């Protein structure tokens, strides 16, 4: 059973609910008759029990959660969040008894991100609730789960693209990132991996790796844990084999053992029929390269009784992608 206090600390708010519904234990569920009969008030079980399935949805694996960790910043009332970015600087000189040369310092920055609040609603009619209950379906709980799914889809979108017109940026369009490099052209025109051999694909990846290592100025090498973000089309192209029967995937695993491939469907451009791939370090000197900030994962507002129905607003708040180390992210577009 999920702990209510821990859930609140992680950004899940269920209003006046004091416990989670145990769907595995019929004794914990309200009797059908009590959920079916229309009355002037909201059924007590809706206020007393929280639906644990929304937590399952909002913590399950989704593309952005495989890329970087999520971090809670503030709460529903927080308008802006400020995070700290530190770059280490300095140099050394030959030792001398009376020499004070050489200095070590830091460059600090405090970027600000705005909270974007978004919402959806759950509505249940008396008749539809009664009809679904005949089939042993808790319609209100299922619609809450649907709300959680829609919220999670939105979180994924904002983590990658941000929100237009606000200081909320995504991993794919953060203004602090370096411009994407281009793949190697083969046969005069081909850049897309579907038209390249496994070895030619590997050449493109090596080019991206070299570019990232160079801009990181020695902070990233083969021992650094990294992630390669690719589209489904790119992942499929990586199954090509070279003249020795070795796939691109196998070559990547052998050459870069600390690299993890993550599939991100949004990296495919259907209009151009090309993909982008992103290479990033998980962290540098203990500082994460990127985090996905949120204020509330699931904020359940009061359930409101109407003439013959109930409704509930569910909201959440995001700061998008908080890129702390732009130099630790590189990309290549047109593959």
Walk through the language-model features, giving the residues of each:
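Short, catalytically relevant binding-site loops at active-site mouths
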Residues: 165-166, 177-178, 233-237, 268, ...
């Amino acid at each position: 059973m999920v702990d209510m206090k821990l859930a609140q600390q992680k950004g899940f708010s269920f209003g006046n609910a004091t416990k989670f519904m145990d769907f595995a234990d019929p004794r914990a569920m309200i009797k059908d008759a009590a959920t079916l009969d229309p009355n002037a008030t909201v059924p007590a079980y809706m206020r007393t029990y929280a639906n644990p399935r929304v937590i399952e949805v909002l913590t399950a694996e989704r593309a952005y959660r495989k890329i970087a960790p999520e971090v809670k910043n503030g709460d529903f009332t927080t308008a802006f969040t400020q995070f700290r970015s530190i770059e280490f600087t300095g140099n050394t000189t030959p030792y001398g008894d009376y020499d004070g040369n050489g200095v070590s310092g830091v460059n600090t920055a405090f970027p600000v991100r705005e909270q974007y609040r978004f919402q959806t609603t759950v509505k249940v009619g008396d008749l539809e609730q009664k009809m679904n209950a005949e089939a042993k379906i808790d319609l209100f709980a299922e619609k809450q789960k649907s709300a959680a799914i829609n919220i999670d889809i939105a979180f994924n979108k904002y983590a990658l693209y941000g929100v237009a017109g606000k200081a909320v940026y995504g991993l794919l369009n953060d203004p602090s990132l370096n411009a994407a490099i281009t793949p190697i052209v083969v046969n005069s025109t081909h850049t897309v991996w579907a038209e390249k051999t496994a070895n030619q694909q590997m050449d493109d990846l090596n080019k991206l790796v070299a570019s990232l290592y160079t801009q990181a100025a020695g902070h990233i090498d083969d021992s650094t844990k990294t992630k390669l973000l690719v589209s489904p089309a790119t992942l499929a192209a990586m199954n090509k084999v070279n003249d020795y029967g070795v796939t691109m995937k196998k070559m990547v695993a052998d050459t870069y053992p600390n690299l993890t491939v993550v599939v991100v469907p949004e990296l495919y451009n259907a209009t151009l029929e090309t993909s982008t791939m992103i290479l990033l370090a998980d962290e540098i000197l203990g500082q994460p390269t990127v985090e996905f900030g949120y204020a509330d994962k699931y904020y359940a507002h009061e359930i409101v009784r109407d003439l013959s129905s109930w409704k509930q607003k569910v909201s959440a708040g995001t700061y998008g992608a908080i890129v702390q180390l732009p130099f630790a992210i590189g990309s290549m577009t047109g593959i």
